[in-house]
């Protein structure tokens, strides 16, 4: 089964494809990851279109079965929250167009499932990702956050 974890952002949407063995949920493998980058010099419509088209291409290329994303949170800055909502909206639309079910988790649940601590720092989450997947946690936090939410989803499936 292929699961995509998504960390939404209008500037840099992180994504990670994890593959898990249907018979052994402890066999988790990182297939690929990256960021969908948009320029703030473009219109919001152009930026959302880029997120839509790139994510749709990723979903089709990797035959994704399910998606996971952190639940929305409201930032103290209303403009930042609004831009995040735009990005989330286009991500939800893209997943719906591709007929991929979405599972959402709170940030605290993601951190707790990965580290055992719902208030863990990003460095602690990266450390655990390295141990779980036997990889070097590199790149930006948008990618590690995407990996973390995908692992959280796998652990949630495994619990049932």
From Swiss-Prot:
The keyword Nuclease applies. Homodimer which binds Holliday junction (HJ) DNA. The HJ becomes 2-fold symmetrical on binding to RuvC with unstacked arms; it has a different conformation from HJ DNA in complex with RuvA. In the full resolvosome a probable DNA-RuvA(4)-RuvB(12)-RuvC(2) complex forms which resolves the HJ. Belongs to the RuvC family. It catalyses: Endonucleolytic cleavage at a junction such as a reciprocal single-stranded crossover between two homologous DNA duplexes (Holliday junction). PROSITE patterns: RUVC (PS01321). Its cofactor is Mg(2+). Keywords: Cytoplasm, DNA damage, DNA recombination, DNA repair, DNA-binding, Endonuclease, Hydrolase, Magnesium, Metal-binding, Nuclease. This is Crossover junction endodeoxyribonuclease RuvC. HAMAP family: RuvC. Its EC number is 3.1.21.10. The active site is at 7, 70, 142. One of its GO terms (molecular function) is magnesium ion binding. Its main location: cytoplasm. GO terms for cellular component: cytoplasm; Holliday junction resolvase complex. The RuvA-RuvB-RuvC complex processes Holliday junction (HJ) DNA during genetic recombination and DNA repair. Endonuclease that resolves HJ intermediates. Cleaves cruciform DNA by making single-stranded nicks across the HJ at symmetrical positions within the homologous arms, yielding a 5'-phosphate and a 3'-hydroxyl group; requires a central core of homology in the junction. The consensus cleavage sequence is 5'-(A/T)TT(C/G)-3'. Cleavage occurs on the 3'-side of the TT dinucleotide at the point of strand exchange. Mg(2+) 1 binds at residues 7, 142. GO terms for biological process: DNA recombination; DNA repair. It comes from Ehrlichia ruminantium (strain Gardel). It is found in: Cytoplasm.
């Amino acid at each position: 089964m292929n699961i995509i974890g998504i960390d939404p952002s209008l500037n840099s949407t992180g994504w990670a494809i994890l593959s898990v063995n249907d018979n052994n949920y402890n066999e988790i493998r990182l297939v690929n990851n990256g960021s969908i980058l948009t320029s703030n010099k473009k219109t919001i419509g152009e930026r959302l279109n880029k997120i839509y088209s790139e994510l749709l291409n990723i979903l089709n290329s990797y035959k994704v079965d399910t998606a996971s994303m952190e639940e929305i949170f409201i930032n103290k800055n209303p403009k930042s929250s609004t831009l995040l909502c735009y990005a989330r909206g286009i991500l939800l639309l893209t997943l719906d167009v591709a007929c991929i079910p979405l599972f959402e988790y709170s940030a605290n649940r993601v951190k707790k499932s990965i580290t055992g601590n719902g208030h863990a720092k990003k460095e602690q989450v990266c450390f655990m990702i390295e141990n779980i997947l036997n990889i070097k946690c590199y790149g930006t936090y948008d990618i590690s956050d995407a990996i973390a939410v995908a692992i959280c989803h796998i652990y949630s499936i495994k619990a049932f």
